Amino acid sequence: MIRYFLLVAIIIFLTFIFPIEGIPAVEKTSDSNSVSGEILCLPNTANFSTHDCANLGPSAYISRMSDLGISFPFRVENGTQPDQSLTYVDFRYGEVTRENAKVYASLEDAIKNGEVVRRVDSPYSFISYYDEAVVDGKRYYMVDYGGWMTANDISRIGTPSLFQGRAFTHTPEHSFGWIAFPTETKRSPGFGIDDYTGRELYHYQEVQIYSTTEVDGIEWYMIGPDEWIPEKKEWQRIIGRVIPSKTPPEGVDNGRWIEVNLKDQTIAVYDQGQLVFATLIASGIEPFWTRPGLFQIYQKLDSTPMRGAFEADRSDAYYLEDVPWTMYYDKARALHGAYWHNGFGVPRSHGCVNMSVGDARWLYDWAGEGDWVYVWDPSGETPTDPEVYGDGGA
């Protein structure tokens, strides 16, 4: 059996070296897109001379995919996932579920409904707790290094989002991104043809982008061989895209900058012109946009409380304890971890740039005070008039 396969291999090899007499080579016609003849190039021979065969069929398809950067078997290789230990945070968190919730002076006061030292009065409030106790079947949480709250007023938060972006040792050749809203891929761009593949892309799945085209005003991304997704469906953005660029924004003088892309809801981090990290974010939602411009980090805090209100009746007031890995760069606007939601890739903040805890920790460890933050919106939809912006918030 081995001799048989060896013989076949030798015959195929000799066929390419010495074309069989009687079978003519392909003759090109005046039309460069058409040929006459009987021999097609075999797949994976596109890198060799094709003067004796027609680069059509499977060979042409593989050549076209190769030009886009797609090889067979198809592989996705793009950076590395940062250390998962970065997702760990020292605090345990809870959402305050009762209006004007009481904070008691001691555990005994909480048990007996005794002395109240303050109330949590913001409609949207999250606390961090350091200890807990169960007395007579009822649970209590220690907050503020001594104050206590009852479990009736708090809904504990489990593990914050474990989503992490990608770290790089060199700048990728292609753009890439993460799925912000689950979607099914199509065999061709555009909604006019019902050619869905049946393959669902899940939330936060990473994809490569090999080609783009616009159909009916919507940009479509080729993420694999004959596999396309739209940038958005109606108002819902499908993917957060990163387009690597080695050129620093005007004004960056130290080769280090953090690019915040408001259209795609992504961050790209550059060191000496090389992409070193990228991930999804959640920036400010209308009318609390994250302000475009070039800024510098002016303060770093391992954790800090944040509070604010923009409506006169304080109906939108928020209170957030121990916001991790915070870096202020534009008044009250900061880059920081967000433990209270898992909605990265979609605007939802009061102006700050929200990241997962793990991504915020990576960026916090990399960046220093004075490093540049470049915020921009390629779509031009975010206002640039300074009069539109206040101090911002979480």
Per-segment meaning from a language model:
Residues 1-4:
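Positively charged n-region of N-terminal signal peptides that target proteins for export
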Residues 7-17:
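Bacterial N-terminal signal peptides
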Residues 19-27:
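Boundary at the C-terminal end of the N-terminal hydrophobic targeting segment
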Residues 25, 251-253, 277-280, 285, ...:
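Exported/periplasmic cell-wall-interacting domains
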Residues 26-93, 142-178, 222-254:
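Boundary regions of SH3-family modules and the immediately adjacent low-complexity/disordered segments
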Residues 41-51, 109-134, 193-215:
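Conserved beta-strand/loop element in small beta-rich adapter and peptidoglycan-binding domains
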Residues 98-107, 118-119, 166-210:
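Short, solvent-exposed interaction modules
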Residues 197-200, 211-292:
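Cell wall/extracellular polymer interaction/catalysis modules
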